[in-house]
Design a protein with these regions (language model features):
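Domain-level recognition of nuclease-like catalytic cores that cleave nucleotide substrates
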Residues: 13-20, 93-137
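Short acidic loop-to-beta-strand element that houses the catalytic metal-binding Asp/Glu
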Residues: 34-41, 46-48
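Conserved catalytic cores of phosphodiester-cleaving nucleases, focusing on short active-site segments
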Residues: 38-40, 53-63
Length: 137
């Protein structure tokens, strides 16, 4: 299968999503298909959780690309429902937008929810030693 690219942030076109977009009504008609980049789960003693753990939802964007309107609404809906189910953030830690400047992750600069972070803060974010506010408040 040959990968196709059409997005401004140079993400591959997912064939099944494109097929759905061709066959189903458009966003103007009330049907939206989005893909979420990452669900990250921490569990066990190393992170202070039981075997079920806790998780975050994340979307990655290249450069200064932002969530589109449909993504804002879709991911915001998911976030709101998950927050209702876990208002104290015991299991659901929130939604995060990760912006990066280079696909060489050792050279890239990063922003988490539009805030620039150092490379060390970015690495600490993944191990839960650096905590920042979720995207949706």
């Amino acid at each position: 299968m040959k990968l196709a690219f059409r997005n401004p942030d140079i993400l591959q076109v997912l064939p099944f999503r494109e097929w759905l977009r061709e066959k189903m009504p458009s966003g103007r008609d009330g049907f939206v298909v989005e893909d979420l980049d990452l669900v990250v789960r921490w569990f066990g003693r190393n992170y202070g959780y039981d075997s079920r753990g806790a998780f975050m939802l994340m979307d990655l964007k290249f450069g200064s690309a932002q969530l589109g309107i449909a993504q804002e609404k879709t991911f915001g809906l998911m976030d709101g429902l998950l927050r209702q189910a876990d208002p104290d953030f015991e299991r659901y830690l929130g939604f995060f937008l990760i912006q990066y400047t280079d696909e060489d992750w050792d050279r890239a600069q990063f922003r988490i929810n539009f805030k620039g972070v150092t490379h060390q803060q970015f690495m600490d974010f993944w191990s839960r030693r650096f905590v920042t506010e979720p995207y949706f408040k």
